[in-house]
Amino acid sequence: MIEHSDTGDGAPTLVFIHAFGCDHSDWDAQVAYFSPRHRCIAVDLGGHGATWGRDDHARVETHGSDVVALMKSLDLPPAIVIGNSLGCRVTIDISARVPELTRAVILVDGSRLSPSTSGIHAALGADSAPEGYQDLARAMFAKMFSPGFDPEKVAEMTERATQVAPQLGVSLLADIGRHDLEEMERLLEDIRVPVLALQSTYISPDGRRHSLVHDQSSPYLDLLQEKVCDLSIEIITNCGHYPQVEYPTETNAAIDAFIARLN
């Protein structure tokens, strides 16, 4: 069973799923805010945080199965499942494959890699030696934050990402490319619950990450609008890839408003 925190009480339950190279503590501000009113489960995915990694944690679907197993073991009623980045992919997988576990979905700065960028990711498993993983992780995380964000927190999160086992790191990054190319559109079409896309960045065709401005769309948001039957979109501006960390107050307010609309 994957490691997790279990805090608070109240319905609906909120299940938080972190990004690649991260852990459950990225959601500390959300757990602190929501746990007086909601049961909050924040997981460490396989190979991240306190959860031991296996070879099959190189596949996105394995992480979805792990979270499903945890939710079933806790006998949770249908929950609001909230993911960031890789966690968005896991969240989509859970909602599409095991719909009875999901009351709603919140995608925090998700993305779908373009065919060219997916190809780059898909080649990582073959082209990136595990001994180069730490440099790869540092280069990735250097682009994930807004310019004014706390440099000590940036350093802390970057160093944490380098602690993922190198072979798992390069293999999982490669599998994100496969998942986006082969699975995402079909899975999105299978979601039948309300979805909030809480978006702060977009990836340009050259693979660079940029902050969004109000009312700006992106290929990923366009895809969600095409495939998801019940979609709301909220933009957090001047922010990097982790709005729950950089802008927790705004993130909490957007989640709170979405929950209120569900009720």
Language-model regions: role of each:
Residues 1-15, 35-39, 77, 152, ...:
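Alpha/beta-hydrolase fold catalytic core
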Residues 6-53:
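Conserved HGGG/HGGXW glycine-rich cap/lid loop of the alpha/beta-hydrolase fold
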Residues 92-97, 101-133:
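Flexible "cap/lid" loop of the alpha/beta hydrolase fold
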